[in-house]
Amino acid sequence: NLVHGEGETGDALIREDVDHICFTGSAEVGQHIRKVAAESWHKTTSCEMGSKSACIIFDDVEMSLALEASIASAFKLSGQRCVSSGRILVQRSIYDEFAEKFALEASKLKTGDPFKYNLGSSGCPDGIVWESLIPNEENYYGPIINEQGFNKVKHYNELVASDPKAEVLLSPAYSVNGKSFYSTPMVYKTEWRDCDMGYLRNEVFGPHVAIIPFDTIDDAIRIYNDTEYGLAVGILTNDFRKARIMRDECEAGMIYWNGGSIAAESHLAFGGVKKSGNGFPSAARTFRAVTHEVSWTVNHADKLTFPQGMK
């Protein structure tokens, strides 16, 4: 059953006599759901929430692979995926070269309506024949989800522009078409640091990318882990040893090696750690989340028997 509504509707649903709540959304709402669930003895939760995911690029990888993978990871779906790489960590020996080329590639991305329409008098709104919608390949990504999300992206972009410690490589342009809100990419260079402006550690959820240098593998691990989130990280290196170390030390629920993003593999669990959530709502883990185990002992003897040591 689908029940549509906003906050009040959702709050009523989670207070019903249900055994398990599976939620995908913001960390703030997820935290509220877990508090409500804690008031019950039996209610459990699986929450997949926000992230500050990253792509980590070592200097032994091909530049073309690094660019292709990081562009896709950062800007697919307007950067509005929980696994989008809002941070790109690059080894210092290739940092300047990569940043320049990344900004150039990002500047070529077109944003706009993701569909083409066959207009006609079909009785549909605005005369659009919905069955004839086809992807518009000219545009790499579409709009920000709504005005609230659009204003959030603009807010963080403006913080970056006002910060003397951030070097802006590509400034965004904005446009509004009815209820569609568009932003071109924001790309900037900065050292990892304590930043009270929030844009380095908070989830922006839009085409907003910080390119951050690191020197050693230990630096990369420290920088990646230095947020409240722990959802996804991409490792780009030709060195299997480095990849395994990163896999073991990065605080993330999903790690991909030499790819553009997490693959939609039905047999793999999808979820994170820390503020990114609890539980992995996919694959076999889903069934374990919404069921409970029962220990069933069967006596096949003709008389009553007891476990060893019990009389």
Spans of features found by a protein language model:
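Short helix-initiation/N-cap motifs at beta->coil->alpha
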Residues: 6-9, 51, 215-217
